[in-house]
Amino acid sequence: MAMVTTEAAAAATTAATAAAEKPQDVEKPDYAPYNGASTTADGGTGARARRGDGGGGVVDSVVARWRREDMLDKSPLALHAAAAIFAFVALVLVASNQHGDWMQFDRYQEYRYLLAIASLALLYSLAQAARHAHRMRGGVDPVSSASARLLDFVGDQVVAYLLMSALSAAVPITNRMRSAVVNNFTDATAAAISMAFFSFVALALSAVVSGYKLSKQTYM
């Protein structure tokens, strides 16, 4: 009985020693996020992703702006070249529309007026197209930048309005002729009116572009 008691006391002593030597688990304090920012790896990755998305959006907006400015810079040349081509075709159709007797364009003041305005539109559009082509090739614009946009805006509008007035004069008489007879003379005048209208559309679009540039022009 004494031996059993001694062994039990020895076992209890050994268990107490082992418990004393075992290091206690240190409870780590919970740290609150600083200024509400996430301290996890996922939070850092999300922040980097958000920064990357923002940078890509800025680059896309800059590229889109460059493309828009490049299109606005090249459009006057294309529009004036198109206006010159349509005006030239209208001019040729009217000038060559001579078939004798009453089928002579010069017997009608409406067609003479259309011929004169088509000639003016051709000369103006050619001059503007040549100026813009020279500028885009790196040459010096003969018109100062401060006055160039105003010149484009006013010139395009004036010539476009003149073309519209010529069309308004030529359309009624052509309709009356075609209601009575349809021949080469009336077909040629109708085709000339169509070409003059396309020239008007090109100059009207050019006036819109030049007006937009003029509204964005800075004077400081």
From Swiss-Prot:
The yes or no answer to whether the keyword Cell membrane is present is yes
Where is this chain's protein located in or outside the cell? Cell membrane
Q: Where are the transmembrane segments?
A: 75-95, 110-127, 153-173, 189-209
How the protein sits in the membrane?
A: Multi-pass membrane protein
Annotated region described as Disordered, given as residue ranges: 13-56
Q: Which Pfam families would you find in this protein's record?
A: CASP_dom
What family does the Swiss-Prot or TrEMBL record give for this protein?
A: Belongs to the Casparian strip membrane proteins (CASP) family.
Give the quaternary structure.
Homodimer and heterodimers.
List the keywords (alphabetical). Cell membrane, Glycoprotein, Membrane, Transmembrane, Transmembrane helix
According to its record, what are the GO cellular component terms? plasma membrane
Per the record, ranges on the Extracellular side are 96-109, 174-188
Origin: domain of life: Eukaryota
* Glycosylation sites recorded in the entry for this protein: 184
- InterPro entries, per the entry: CASP_dom
Protein name per the record: CASP-like protein 4B1
Lineage, uppermost ranks: Eukaryota, Viridiplantae, Streptophyta, Embryophyta, Tracheophyta
